[in-house]
């Protein structure tokens, strides 16, 4: 067999493998997004066990992409994989809520002080995200609002130009979005307050007011007793 034929024979399987991987990847992505969005929408209650076979039928895939999706969702703390029982939707506790807010305050307040000290101003993307959030709020699309809210705060953190801190902040993204969705589902009246605080935050950054912006952030992330009571202890 010529070297050219050998090369062709070796190449064809690798192309097929790449194609198979693409199909598996797209199915896994679809399964991941479907299950994640169902959890965020409250279709699966906290503490509920979800069955791989049922999920595969609803997503329209085999069990393998569903299993891979659940493994990713475990890493992102949407579910816990319990031996011999399967995937259980994680319960968001009041303690976890406080810890997420505390972590956010540490990272975001540092970013605000840096941005204001450097007089860097508001990132353009943040202004656009505020407008998009107001549209999502008007539509009462809490999941969409929470996703945009995370992007808004992430843009501000990234604006201080510290890639390590930005990556640390974004590692909170899955829990931040889930918590935001749950917050507005439990207390939709908070929407107007949240939107007002976003505008106040932008104004403080525009004025290069470091401590003023941190004060707004502190109000924005403060504990609301009636909201904390909605979460498990």
Model-assigned labels for residue ranges:
Residues 1-117, 225, 229-233:
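Short linear motifs at protein or domain termini
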Residues 2-11, 127-135, 139, 178-233:
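C-terminal all-alpha effector/ligand-binding and dimerization domain
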Residues 38, 43, 136, 157, ...:
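Hydrophobic side-chain positions on well-ordered alpha-helices
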Residues 81, 94-95, 124, 196, ...:
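Charged, amphipathic alpha-helical coiled-coil/dimerization segments
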Residues 100, 126, 145, 149, ...:
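Hydrophobic packing residues in well-ordered alpha-helices of helical domains and bundles
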Residues 103-118, 150-188, 227:
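Hydrophobic, amphipathic alpha-helical faces that serve as interaction scaffolds
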Residues 108-135:
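Amphipathic alpha-helical dimerization/coiled-coil segments
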